[in-house]
Each structure stands twice: as C-alpha cells, then as structure tokens.
C-alpha cells in the first residue's frame, strides 16, 4: 500500500534573506591569528600525554598547562639537545599551532641517538597536543605531517657482505 504525502506550505517568515550576506565579510584567513584569538580559539589548555618513536628511540611525553618549560630526563631542552636544529625540530608542533609558552613539557626518552630522540620527542609532543584538543589541533598537525611515524630504520647487515648492501671488492682474476 502506498501512502500519499501531504505537502506542507512553507511560511515566508522561515526563509532567510540570503542577500544580506556577502563574501567580503571580515573573517580571519587560515593561519592569520592574533594573540587574542589564540586564547578564544583554543580555550583553556588541557593536560595530555603522547608516545613517540623514531629509529630506536622512544619518548614518553606529558604536556601540562604552564609557561613553556621543558624537562627531558630531568634536564632542560638546551641541556639535553645542545644543537639548535634538534631544539627547533622538537618545538615545531608548538610553532605550527601558535601555542609556544602555553604548555610545560615533561618527557622521558630512552634508546637511539640524538637525532632519533629528537624525532621521537617531536612525534610524542604532536600526539599529546592532538589529544589535548582534537578539534582544533588535528588538522594543522596532520597537514604539517607531525602525526605520522617515520618508520625508517637501519637496514640489517647481511652475511657475505661488509655492510647491509656493500659487497667485498670483486676481482675478476
């Protein structure tokens, strides 16, 4: 059995006047935020945690609302990573989100070398920031590629070769 539907008449008071809107209304362009809009855009900072891995390094990261202090294995960022390149790499997620100085970072890092540890810490910080506010942070972090684990690792040495791929010198005679 087919039912017939009765169409309800649309009242003219419910129709919104589209002509009152313009495309030239003042809205901040993506990436252009003032200091006042950062607080309103993110609200109150929330504590969060994240785990990062790179090569053989593992970083367990906690971020808590604060003033931007870093504690890595009980040492400051400058003491733990004296190289400015590694300091900048670790700080990139905060720069992309314009959240520098809003969180204190407490991290435990083990294994690997300096470069691997910096990469692991960056991934851990990015995951913690993502967990703190998924709605506002995830898009920018994904676009920058900070939420993706870099799974490249050292290739193992093979039997009969000097290194992973380097063969001993070949002599024809």
From Swiss-Prot:
Region described as Disordered: 20-53
PROSITE patterns per UniProt: RIBOSOMAL_S9
Domain of life: Bacteria
Gene Ontology CC annotations of this record: cytoplasm; small ribosomal subunit
GO terms for biological process, alphabetical: translation
Pfam families cross-referenced by the UniProt entry: Ribosomal_S9
InterPro entries xref list: Ribosomal_Su5_D2-typ_SF, Ribosomal_uS9, Ribosomal_uS9_bac/plastid, Ribosomal_uS9_CS, Ribsml_uS5_D2-typ_fold_subgr
Keywords tagged on the record: Ribonucleoprotein, Ribosomal protein
GO molecular function list: RNA binding; structural constituent of ribosome
Family as reported in the entry's similarity comment: Belongs to the universal ribosomal protein uS9 family.
PANTHER family, sorted: RIBOSOMAL PROTEIN S9, SMALL RIBOSOMAL SUBUNIT PROTEIN US9M
The protein's name in its UniProt record: Small ribosomal subunit protein uS9
Native source species: Streptomyces avermitilis (strain ATCC 31267 / DSM 46492 / JCM 5070 / NBRC 14893 / NCIMB 12804 / NRRL 8165 / MA-4680)
């Amino acid at each position: 059995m087919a039912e017939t539907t009765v169409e309800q008449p649309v009242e003219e008071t419910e129709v919104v006047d589209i002509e009152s809107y313009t495309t030239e209304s003042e809205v901040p362009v993506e990436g252009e935020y003032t200091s006042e809009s950062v607080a309103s855009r993110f609200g109150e900072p929330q504590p969060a945690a994240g785990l990062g891995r790179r090569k053989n390094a593992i970083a367990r990261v906690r971020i808590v609302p604060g003033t931007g202090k870093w504690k890595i294995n009980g040492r400051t960022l400058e003491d733990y990573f004296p190289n400015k390149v590694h300091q900048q790499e670790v700080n990139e997620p905060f720069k992309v989100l314009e959240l520098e100085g809003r969180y204190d970072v407490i991290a435990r890092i083990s294994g690997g070398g300096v470069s691997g540890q910096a990469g692991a810490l960056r991934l851990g910080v990015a995951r913690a920031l993502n967990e703190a506010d998924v709605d506002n942070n995830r898009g920018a972090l994904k676009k920058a590629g900070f939420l993706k684990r870099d799974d490249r690792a050292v290739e193992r040495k093979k039997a009969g070769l000097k290194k992973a791929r380097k063969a001993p010198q070949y002599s024809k005679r």
